[in-house]
A protein has these predicted regions:
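Glycine-rich phosphate-binding loop and adjoining helix at the ATP-binding site
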Residues: 12, 16-25, 29, 33, ...
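Glycine-rich His-Gly loop
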Residues: 50-51, 114
């Protein structure tokens, strides 16, 4: 495909994240209108999410978005009228690197992503590894930090994400100031 436009919209996590998919749908409809296109001009939507995702489009919790278990692909497809495929954002990043980036010379690879959270994308023989309940590569919530007093977004204490994510680094720096 050809990238026609790239923008960012705010992620409204209030109301349990229930506004996120409607916001995305409205944004997509606005972009299509701006470009004099219709949903028939779009083959599909691919969306990477920060959490465990199953191949059928079900999100198995996206803690940072406030989501529980539901079929996000079906919901967004119903809102837009366009077929949707979802996946873990770290797996999607790893696939991109595997196809056209630094991993293109290998059959298998692991990619670690660091941002709001910490994730891992695992590619085995050219295919993403999903694992049990879509949790393969979900390294951000491994309990690695002893003595952490604050709870992680997942409710546990001592997760790697609490100190190694961009959010965690800022939190640690603020504590030290």
């Amino acid at each position: 495909g050809e990238l026609l436009r790239k923008e960012e919209i705010p992620t409204r996590k209030d109301e349990g994240g229930s506004l996120i998919l409607p916001d995305i749908s409205e944004y997509i409809k606005g972009v299509l209108a701006d470009m004099n296109m219709t949903t028939e001009d779009v083959a599909g939507i691919g969306m990477g999410l920060p959490g465990a995702c199953l191949e059928d489009g079900t999100v198995n919790k996206c803690i940072n978005l406030g989501w529980g278990v539901f079929n996000a692909a079906n919901v967004l497809s119903e809102l837009t009228g366009i077929p949707v495929k979802i996946g873990n954002d770290a797996n999607m990043a790893a696939l991109g690197e595997f196809w056209v980036g630094g991993g293109s010379e290998y059959n298998s690879m692991v990619m670690v992503t660091i941002g709001t959270g910490v994730g891992g994308g695992v590619i085995i023989d050219g295919k993403p590894l999903y694992g049990f309940n879509g949790a393969a590569g979900e390294i951000g919530h491994l309990p690695l930090v002893e003595g952490e007093t604050e709870s992680c977004n997942c409710g546990k204490k001592g997760c790697l994400e609490q100190v190694a994510s961009a959010t965690g680094i800022v939190r640690t720096a603020n504590r030290m100031l």
